């Protein structure tokens, strides 16, 4: 599995381009990600195995993935909710809570990734939940810890793409439930008879504002503080037993 940290050179978790130049930070080119994917997919031809690309972030990577899937190679692909909801401009002036791995890319990359979900090139949307203490995120950008929490905001951010008509609801559900379960070969992700009764009850339209202090996570390093969202989980059942309720 190719994970985000393999795509990130130390102290370079910002996209290489206009924003990195303006902020005076060392950037990481999307070509680095593309090269790793090309390498691994070449190895897949020689050594067939189950292979999952955990998080891609660029149009360049999608081009490689499309070519290989059209050639019949079997593998799965994931993308972080951050990379389909935000772009490098959201970093503004050194917003370290948006230092992520893989880094936020161009708006064109974000749109391409959303399209990749829609056409089936990307199979899974992940939270990239990376807890860090706030002090480690409040350092100068190059020294700040990488990552953001994401479990509680994964679904609402994904629903934003539904509300703005970027993605159909069934595709979002598929990428959050059915596909991950199929990849992991576990009996979850559907409501069919015999499946584990892991169920979320959702209000698709409930408005709320992200406040780190109100999140359940012990770590509070959210990348979307004060963001207005629409849609929230009201109840969660695990194997039929209620484990969460607002």
Tell me what each language-model feature is:
Residues 1-4, 8-9:
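Single conserved hydrophobic/aromatic residue that forms the stacking wall/gate
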Residues 5-6, 40-56:
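Divalent metal-dependent hydrolysis catalytic cores, especially in the metallo-beta-lactamase
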Residues 10-18, 89-94:
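Short, flexible, mixed-charge acidic loops at enzyme active sites
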Residues 13-14, 66-71, 217:
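Short, solvent-exposed amphipathic alpha-helical segments in soluble enzyme
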Residues 20-48, 116-125, 130-204:
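His/Asp/Glu-enriched, well-ordered alpha-helical/loop segment
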Residues 21-32, 98-108, 145-149, 222-228:
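A short acidic, glycine-rich active-site loop
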Residues 50, 54-156, 160:
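Active-site neighborhoods of metal-dependent hydrolases
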Residues 140-143, 196-246:
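C-terminal cap of metal-dependent C-N hydrolases
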């Amino acid at each position: 599995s190719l994970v985000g940290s393999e795509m990130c050179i130390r102290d370079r978790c910002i996209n290489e381009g206009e924003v990195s130049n303006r902020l005076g930070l060392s950037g990481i080119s999307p070509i680095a990600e593309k090269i790793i994917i090309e390498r691994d997919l070449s190895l897949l031809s020689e050594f067939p195995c189950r292979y999952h690309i955990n998080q891609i972030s660029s149009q360049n990577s999608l081009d490689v993935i499309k070519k290989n899937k059209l050639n019949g190679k079997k593998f799965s692909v994931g993308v972080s909710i951050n990379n389909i909801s935000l772009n490098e401009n959201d970093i503004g002036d050194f917003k370290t809570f948006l230092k992520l791995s893989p880094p936020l890319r161009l708006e064109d990359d974000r749109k391409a990734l959303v399209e990749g979900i829609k056409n089936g090139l990307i199979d899974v949307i992940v939270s990239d939940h990376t807890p860090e203490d706030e002090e480690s995120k409040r350092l100068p950008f190059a020294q700040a810890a990488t990552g953001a929490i994401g479990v509680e905001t994964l679904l609402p951010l994904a629903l934003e793409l539904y509300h703005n008509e970027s993605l159909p609801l069934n595709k979002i559900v598929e990428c959050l439930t059915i596909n991950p379960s199929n990849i992991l070969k576990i009996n979850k992700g559907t409501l069919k008879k015999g499946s584990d009764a892991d169920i979320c009850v959702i209000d698709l339209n409930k408005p709320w504002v992200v406040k780190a202090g109100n999140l359940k996570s012990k770590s509070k390093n959210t990348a979307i503080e004060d963001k207005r969202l629409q849609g929230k989980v009201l109840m969660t059942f695990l194997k039929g037993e209620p484990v969460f309720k607002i």
